[in-house]
């Protein structure tokens, strides 16, 4: 999440956790590391300064609560202050009227049309019927893109490439989808200086009378997001914001903090290219993952999406206990294929930095290869991986059409991951990190 920012902050917290003595010098060193990471992520310097000041004052003057060590207390302070930086609370999209009308706004290239497809998918999974109206008369491919991004989702699309009147398209789409639970209106990409387009946006808003106007902001623009959000806010009443492209953006932290600074609620974030890579934005969960503390609640929710609830609990236990067999690992691989990129899934585990480096680089191709290899194993081998020696490795490789080295690689990955995850068990999570994780796991 957020590329280098997540790695830098997680590394800083890991370094702090390993300190034997925590004094004023250590506190200032930690703050410098945090400052460096945030500035590199394009967070506004004034915000970084205020955050640093708050952390320093609390770390040097507050007494740790009973049973909490000084370094655990500092980690907790960093967590608290960074959550405040991003707005503290989450804002859910509440569909409380029908048809619930959502007007989508955003600059061209912000990922607006893609995000409409993702939100339509999100709403369909919640059981709502969805209609999407294309009022973008500026881009010839706008309607086709909407159809492409909503394909197979049972979402109705309305648009007319011959009609150049965006207001007429909005009126007709509104009339057509009156029986839908939710109507989403796609609009032309706007530039904050294009007065004609901003005026059209105001006119569209008057016709649609949206329950909510959602502004889509490209996370790669960093703190420029502040000015963009303010420009749109002057033209219409923005209900919420979605920040996209946070899966690898170097400036994502700057975009998130800039938007939060002006008080605009961030409801969702885009975390990848897949249709399911849209997450409800929760500052507490988000910061927990950035600091390497994991997000077991989100992980459990993802698991529950692809399995029965009872299996979800067992799967989480298997991941954390380190007792799972190759059979369990096969189930995990199958589920991870549905849950999203492995790097995102792993970031939800507390202490994910302890996992083997290759774990975060696992590709879908590698997972498919490993599944084929495991399909060539006997029931006994899946249950007792330790019995797989030279002759069995050769047989499994021949049966799966892979090399001996591939089978050995799988077994090595299994052993190392099992050992690493064993250290992440629920009983071993103490201090504020443990309290947070146990709260997430309720």
From Swiss-Prot:
Catalytic reaction list: GTP + H2O = GDP + phosphate + H(+)
UniProt keyword terms in alphabetical order: Cytoplasm, GTP-binding, Hydrolase, Nucleotide-binding, Ribonucleoprotein, RNA-binding, Signal recognition particle
SUPFAM superfamilies: Domain of the SRP/SRP receptor G-proteins, P-loop containing nucleoside triphosphate hydrolases, Signal peptide-binding domain
EC number: 3.6.5.4
Superkingdom of the organism of origin: Archaea
PROSITE patterns for this protein: SRP54
Keyword GTP-binding among record annotations: yes
GO molecular function terms listed in the Swiss-Prot or TrEMBL record: 7S RNA binding; ATP hydrolysis activity; GTP binding; GTPase activity
Residues given in the record as GTP binding sites: 106-113, 186-190, 244-247
InterPro entries: AAA+_ATPase, P-loop_NTPase, Signal_recog_part_SRP54_M_sf, Signal_recog_particl_SRP54_hlx, Signal_recog_particle_SRP54_M, SRP/SRP_N, SRP54, SRP54_GTPase_dom
Subcellular location: Cytoplasm
EC top class, as a word: hydrolase
GO biological process: SRP-dependent cotranslational protein targeting to membrane
Record Pfam families: SRP54, SRP54_N, SRP_SPB
Any one GO CC term of the record: signal recognition particle
Main location: cytoplasm
Domain notes from UniProt: Composed of three domains: the N-terminal N domain, which is responsible for interactions with the ribosome, the central G domain, which binds GTP, and the C-terminal M domain, which binds the RNA and the signal sequence of the RNC.
Family: Belongs to the GTP-binding SRP family. SRP54 subfamily.
Subunit: Part of the signal recognition particle protein translocation system, which is composed of SRP and FtsY. Archaeal SRP consists of a 7S RNA molecule of 300 nucleotides and two protein subunits: SRP54 and SRP19.
Function in brief: Involved in targeting and insertion of nascent membrane proteins into the cytoplasmic membrane. Binds to the hydrophobic signal sequence of the ribosome-nascent chain (RNC) as it emerges from the ribosomes. The SRP-RNC complex is then targeted to the cytoplasmic membrane where it interacts with the SRP receptor FtsY.
Protein's name according to its UniProt entry: Signal recognition particle 54 kDa protein
Organism: Methanothermobacter thermautotrophicus (strain ATCC 29096 / DSM 1053 / JCM 10044 / NBRC 100330 / Delta H) (Methanobacterium thermoautotrophicum)
Chain's gene name: srp54
């Amino acid at each position: 999440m957020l590329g280098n920012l997540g790695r830098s902050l997680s590394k800083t917290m890991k370094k702090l956790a390993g300190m034997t003595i925590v004094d004023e010098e250590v506190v200032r060193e930690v703050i410098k590391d945090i400052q460096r990471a945030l500035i590199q992520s394009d967070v506004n310097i004034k915000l970084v300064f205020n955050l640093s000041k708050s952390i320093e004052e609390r770390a040097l003057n507050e007494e740790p609560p009973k049973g909490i060590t000084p370094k655990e207390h500092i980690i907790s302070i960093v967590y608290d202050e960074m959550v405040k930086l991003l707005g503290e609370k989450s804002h859910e999209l509440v569909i409380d009227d029908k048809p619930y009308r959502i007007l989508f706004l955003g600059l061209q290239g912000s990922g607006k049309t893609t995000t409409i497809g993702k939100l339509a998918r999100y709403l369909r999974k919640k059981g709502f019927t969805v209609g999407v109206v294309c009022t973008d008369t500026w881009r010839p491919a706008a309607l086709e893109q909407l159809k492409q991004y909503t394909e197979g989702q049972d979402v109705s699309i309305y648009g007319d490439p011959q009609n150049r009147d965006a207001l007429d398209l909005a009126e007709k789409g509104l009339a057509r989808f009156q029986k839908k639970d939710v109507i989403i209106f796609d609009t032309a990409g706007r530039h904050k200086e294009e007065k004609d387009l901003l005026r059209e946006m105001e006119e569209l808003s008057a016709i649609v009378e949206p329950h909510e106007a959602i502004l889509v902001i490209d996370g790669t623009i960093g703190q420029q997001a502040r000015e963009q959000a303010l420009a749109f806010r002057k033209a219409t009443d923005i209900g919420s914001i979605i920040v996209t492209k946070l899966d690898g953006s170097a400036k994502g932290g700057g975009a998130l903090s800039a938007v939060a600074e002006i008080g605009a609620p961030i409801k969702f974030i885009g975390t990848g290219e897949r249709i399911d890579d849209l997450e409800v934005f929760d500052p507490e969960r988000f910061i927990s993952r950035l600091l390497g503390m994991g997000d077991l609640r989100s992980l459990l929710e993802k698991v529950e999406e692809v399995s029965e609830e009872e299996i979800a609990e067992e799967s989480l236990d298997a991941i954390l206990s380190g007792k799972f067999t190759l059979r369990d690992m096969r189930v995990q691989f199958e589920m991870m294929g549905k849950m999203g990129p492995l790097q995102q899934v792993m970031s939800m585990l507390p202490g994910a930095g302890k996992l083997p480096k290759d774990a975060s680089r696992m590709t879908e191709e590698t997972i498919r290869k490993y599944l084929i290899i495991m399909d060539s194993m006997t029931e006994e081998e899946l249950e007792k991986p330790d019995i797989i020696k030279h002759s069995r490795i050769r047989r499994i490789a021949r049966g799966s059409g892979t090399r001996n080295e591939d089978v050995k690689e799988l077994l090595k990955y299994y052993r190392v991951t099992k050992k690493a995850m064993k250290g992440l068990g629920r009983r071993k999570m103490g201090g504020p990190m443990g309290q947070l994780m146990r709260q997430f796991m309720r």
